[in-house]
Amino acid sequence: MAWMTRRTLKTAAIAGLAIAASGGAAVTTAGLMWPNTISPDLAPVHEMRADQALLAQYPQTIKADRESQAALAQAPAAANAWLRRAYVRQLGTRTLDAQALDYIDKSYRAAPLGPDVTRWRLRFIFEHWSEMTPALRTRAVDEMRNFARYHSGGPDLVRAIHNPAGRWAAALVERSGHNEALRDHGMLAKAAE
């Protein structure tokens, strides 16, 4: 090893790390592109499989729940997986029982203000507004107000809600958040003139 200089060793180490990183990236990418063929035990792969199971003509709720559990084993703070478990539970029981409400609460603990899960979670909660606990309603109101302040999709989200009570509540909160955004930018007084 006397013939290897310090610079040669550094170059060899960097090349080795680059090869290992590209191999890991290839396995991960292949697993995400073909989740049924190559199956690394990664949370995003399990989440893709769970989504595919629910998108089937006849939703495969047991498979979706099993894949969501596997995703949570890899990434316990995956708000989408917690919310999907609540959705699957609701499909099975036709109501939001205590377990489903607990899953929704866990999705809020994982990601209180989204952002990736916000639209789906808000629509799901406002569709089942009468079944929500006061604590979950408060969290949904805070999330909707925040969403309306910083995003332009609030009215579209409200229109997508079919439950009349939930749509009414969402519309009030969305308007409140929108007005707060206008007030923050000094535009509310101008709009009233």
Residue ranges and their predicted role:
Residues 81, 97-104:
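Extracytoplasmic beta-rich ectodomain segments of secreted or membrane-anchored proteins
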Residues 50-62, 86-97, 127-133:
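Short coil/turn linking the two alpha-helices of tandem helical-hairpin repeats
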Residues 92, 117-134, 156-167:
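TPR/TPR-like alpha-solenoid helical repeat scaffolds
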Residues 81-83, 117, 153:
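TPR alpha-solenoid repeat register
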Residues 42, 78-81, 114-115:
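Residue-level recognition of tetratricopeptide repeat
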Residues 2-74, 141-193:
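N-terminal alpha-helical interaction modules that lie
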